[in-house]
């Protein structure tokens, strides 16, 4: 029972609960980050050591901050936004703390990457610089103001590779194992195993899974 004679007690207890909850998640965050570092080391032929990946790769810096910010997002959204903006300022990689990102995630190079609030990214996904996972449009309320807290960003399933400069917009699904080529503009879902490639004159889709 909280006493009215001690108005500070309630926020103190809330803060203690948040800190304890966060501390309890640190082992799982560490496991996720181990997988992210391993994905970067194994996914980049220019990486010569795990130490190099940890110390030199902006994508790793950004995902470390994101894993922490995402864990805090539900309870302390302002703090999580501050954390994500520190990473954004340092790396040029803008990941909203609300985005859900699976294990083994690798951002190579990274400058200009944008990942929106309601994105859902599966496991072992690799993306390159200047990729945008954003909203196709912003919905409005009856009074003309922008709606808040609605789903508007892509789902990227497991084992997808998205090359530099690709723009993927709206609540669409990029099927498992797909490859999205550089500079592709995509606003529709694609099946598992698709290759979406951009030629100088046209964009074309190839599905490399039988059936």
Residue spans for each PLM region:
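Terminal amphipathic alpha-helical/low-complexity segments used for targeting or macromolecular assembly
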Residues: 1-85, 209-211
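Structural signal for interior beta-strand "rungs" in well-ordered beta-sheet cores
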Residues: 88-204, 208
């Amino acid at each position: 029972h909280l006493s009215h004679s001690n108005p500070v007690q309630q926020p103190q207890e809330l803060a203690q609960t948040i800190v304890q909850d966060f501390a309890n998640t640190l082992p799982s965050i560490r496991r996720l980050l181990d997988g992210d570092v391993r994905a970067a080391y194994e996914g980049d032929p220019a990486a010569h050591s795990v130490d190099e990946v940890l110390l030199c790769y902006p994508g790793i810096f950004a995902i470390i901050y994101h894993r922490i910010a995402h864990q805090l997002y539900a309870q302390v959204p302002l703090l999580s936004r501050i954390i994500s903006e520190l990473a954004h300022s340092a790396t040029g990689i803008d990941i909203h703390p609300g985005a859900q990102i699976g294990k083994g995630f690798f951002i190579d190079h990274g400058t200009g990457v944008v990942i929106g609030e309601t994105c859902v990214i599966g496991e072992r996904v690799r993306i390159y610089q200047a990729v945008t996972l954003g909203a196709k449009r912003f919905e409005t309320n009856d009074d003309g103001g922008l709606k808040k807290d609605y789903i508007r960003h892509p789902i990227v399933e497991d084992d997808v590779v998205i090359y530099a400069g690709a723009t993927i917009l709206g609540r669409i699904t990029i099927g498992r194992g797909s490859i999205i080529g550089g500079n592709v503009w995509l606003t529709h879902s694609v099946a598992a195993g698709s290759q979406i490639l951009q030629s100088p004159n046209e964009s074309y889709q190839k599905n490399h899974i039988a059936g």
